Amino acid sequence: MLVTLGLLTSFFSFLYMVAPSIRKFFAGGVCRTNVQLPGKVVVITGANTGIGKETARELASRGARVYIACRDVLKGESAASEIRVDTKNSQVLVRKLDLSDTKSIRAFAEGFLAEEKQLHILINNAGVMMCPYSKTADGFETHLGVNHLGHFLLTYLLLERLKVSAPARVVNVSSVAHHIGKIPFHDLQSEKRYSRGFAYCHSKLANVLFTRELAKRLQGTGVTTYAVHPGVVRSELVRHSSLLCLLWRLFSPFVKTAREGAQTSLHCALAEGLEPLSGKYFSDCKRTWVSPRARNNKTAERLWNVSCELLGIRWE
């Protein structure tokens, strides 16, 4: 027992000693474009913390007017204040957006459209992960409702503003977890069977399929769209899982920081020449492969139609 404990102690001591080298290896790609954004308007959901906050910070540093769209306005204002000071850009604004409530989504969109005549970048970044079973205000399973349907509706409501501002981009933050996901059309609300882990994976697959179908429907409009995997990042998303919280504490020296996790979102929002890759999936600032389910055009179209039906909208 003592020998085993000693070996484990030595192993973890060694890991932490070489952590800087390991982290450098796993830090991933870097957005290298120097594009500046004066006069450009950006909306980022969930930008009060984590990857979204770092994405907002970078875009604000390039001169964009950035809207932090989040549920907790107080946390949003705290993040915005910090970003304004860091970037010397006063045009960092906070607006309430609760993706678990379609009334809130519609109210946000109505307010934004009244304020702004243009929208150049929409980053659908917010999300939930491994929540206990619950439903949104509209009766959707929470992962499906927040991670997919909420952003689906938001994009629909803001799309005409994106079109008149073209060239414009929509970035959907997905995850490598989509490889495990499937779309359970027979039980979309997980009422028959629920696994918090699989529910998250299913919603991330929905993000990739939405991106694929959206790109097809946006051809010729000047609006392009991309799905991204940010990497394994220190994040508040794991707060609903005590096991993941423990693992995060143990392995935090080896995972990406929020700033590193933001790089692929920034790349897809800013990099020149990505238009031919609209609808594709990116990781570490380069296109990468998706699961066979994520390449299924029939599933993508069916999900689109079912999403419209659930939300009560017509989106041809």
From Swiss-Prot:
InterPro entries: NAD(P)-bd_dom_sf, SDR_fam. Pfam families: adh_short. Widely expressed, mostly in retina, kidney, brain, skeletal muscle, pancreas and stomach. Pathway: Cofactor metabolism; retinol metabolism. The active site is at Y200 (proton acceptor). It comes from the Eukaryota. Changing G145E: In retinal dystrophy; exhibits a profound loss of catalytic activity. Its EC number is 1.1.1.300. Changing V146D: In RP53; uncertain significance. Keywords: Disease variant, Endoplasmic reticulum, Leber congenital amaurosis, Lipid metabolism, Membrane, NADP, Oxidoreductase, Retinitis pigmentosa, Sensory transduction, Vision. NADP(+) binds at G46, A47, N48, T49, G50, I51, G52. Signal peptide: none annotated. Retinoids dehydrogenase/reductase with a clear preference for NADP. Displays high activity towards 9-cis, 11-cis and all-trans-retinal. Shows very weak activity towards 13-cis-retinol. Also exhibits activity, albeit with lower affinity than for retinaldehydes, towards lipid peroxidation products (C9 aldehydes) such as 4-hydroxynonenal and trans-2-nonenal. May play an important function in photoreceptor cells to detoxify 4-hydroxynonenal and potentially other toxic aldehyde products resulting from lipid peroxidation. Has no dehydrogenase activity towards steroids. Belongs to the short-chain dehydrogenases/reductases (SDR) family. It is linked to Leber congenital amaurosis 13: A severe dystrophy of the retina, typically becoming evident in the first years of life. Visual function is usually poor and often accompanied by nystagmus, sluggish or near-absent pupillary responses, photophobia, high hyperopia and keratoconus. Retinitis pigmentosa 53: A retinal dystrophy belonging to the group of pigmentary retinopathies. Retinitis pigmentosa is characterized by retinal pigment deposits visible on fundus examination and primary loss of rod photoreceptor cells followed by secondary loss of cone photoreceptors. Patients typically have night vision blindness and loss of midperipheral visual field. As their condition progresses, they lose their far peripheral visual field and eventually central vision as well. RP53 inheritance is autosomal dominant or autosomal recessive. This is Retinol dehydrogenase 12. It comes from Homo sapiens. The lineage of its organism: Eukaryota, Metazoa, Chordata, Craniata, Vertebrata.
